[in-house]
Structures are given as structure tokens and as C-alpha cells.
């Protein structure tokens, strides 16, 4: 009799865990469709850059020509204001004007 009572007890806990594993596979199923999406996007990405590459090559030589001209002018403008600031400290009466200019900035 005691031997029979042992198998009866384990039979009850077995059916209880059954509903738990049923929920777990449902979570795994949505993970599967997420994987194929990135695979499809990877194929689309390489197709786009191929046609875009030949287009920028002819445009690049035209754009850099006007660009270098602008920075040269900007550098020259920065050098000009630096020159008048140097002679100002040589004169005794103008250091006051320098203070006002720095305060305004």
C-alpha cells in the first residue's frame, strides 16, 4: 500500500507544470519572426549604395573647387583685425578703449 501512495502523489504535480511550458513556447515564437526581418534589411542596404556611389564621383570634383576659396578669405579676415590690436598697447591713452571693447564682447 505505501508503494502505491508514492506514485499517486507525483502524478498531481506533473499536470500542474504542463500549462507553464505551454506559455513559454509562445514567447519563443515571436522571437523567430524578428530574426528574418534583419536578414531582409541587410539585403536591401547593399543594393542602395551601389547606385549612389557612381553619382557622387562626378559631383565631388565640382564641389571642392568653390569650397577652398571660401576658407582662404575667412583666414585673411581673421589676420587683419589682429594687426590693429598690436599697436594699441604701444600708446598710453588707448589702453582704456581696449578695456571697453573687451567688456562689450
UniProtKB/Swiss-Prot annotation:
Coiled coil: none annotated. Disulfide bonds: none annotated. Residues 1-105 are annotated as: Disordered. Developing endosperm. It comes from the Eukaryota. Residues 10-22, 48-69 have a biased composition (Pro residues). Residues 23-39, 70-83 have a biased composition (Low complexity). The keyword rRNA processing does not apply. GO terms for molecular function: nutrient reservoir activity. Keywords: Seed storage protein, Storage protein. The keyword Transcription does not apply. Sulfur-poor seed storage protein. This is C-hordein. It comes from Hordeum vulgare.
Amino acid at each position: 500500500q505505501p508503494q502505491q501512495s508514492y506514485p499517486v502523489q507525483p502524478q498531481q504535480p506533473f499536470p500542474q507544470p504542463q500549462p507553464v511550458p505551454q506559455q513559454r513556447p509562445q514567447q519563443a515564437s515571436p522571437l523567430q519572426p524578428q530574426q528574418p526581418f534583419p536578414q531582409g534589411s541587410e539585403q536591401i542596404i547593399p543594393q542602395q549604395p551601389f547606385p549612389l556611389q557612381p553619382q557622387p564621383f562626378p559631383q565631388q570634383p565640382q564641389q571642392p573647387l568653390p569650397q577652398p576659396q571660401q576658407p582662404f578669405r575667412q583666414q585673411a579676415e581673421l589676420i587683419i583685425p589682429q594687426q590693429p590690436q598690436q599697436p594699441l598697447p604701444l600708446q598710453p591713452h588707448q589702453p582704456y578703449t581696449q578695456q571697453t571693447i573687451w567688456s562689450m564682447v
